[in-house]
Amino acid sequence: MRAVETIVRFSRLEPRLRLLATEAVLNLARARLAIRLLPFRRAIDFGAIPLGEGRGEDVGAIVRSVEAAAWRLPWRSVCLDQGLALQRALRRRGQDARLHYGLTAPGSGPLSAHAWVVLDGEVLLGGERAGSHCSVAIFPAD
């Protein structure tokens, strides 16, 4: 039943949002494959593409499309999948989105990793856990 509802909702979206949703699903799938099949350094390059031409698109709509698609996919999309997918979509549109990769601070509990996306100093995705992690790398590096 959930699949049918998702298809019906998708068909009711305005064309611009339908295109964003399709791009989000494709980027999430490609990011997941890159993470599973490639060495980390090559996989991380999936999102760190050269900046495209700016189109003045609604950044919030792009973020929401990645978040919504991640919830509806038949596999679990983790923060790194989502971060790479969002970073790629934004950079393609000329937005200098940066993917931060962080680890929990020493002595603050078990080691865990997290990824979040920052644009112009604002955390767009993954911010709910970013505060408990220390950024150890930013992609692309300056």
Q: Each predicted region: which residue ranges?
A:
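Secondary-structure boundary elements
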Residues: M1-V78, Q82-A85, R91, P110-S112, ...
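Short, well-structured beta-strand/strand-turn elements
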Residues: R93-G107
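N-terminal amphipathic alpha-helical segments
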Residues: F139-P140
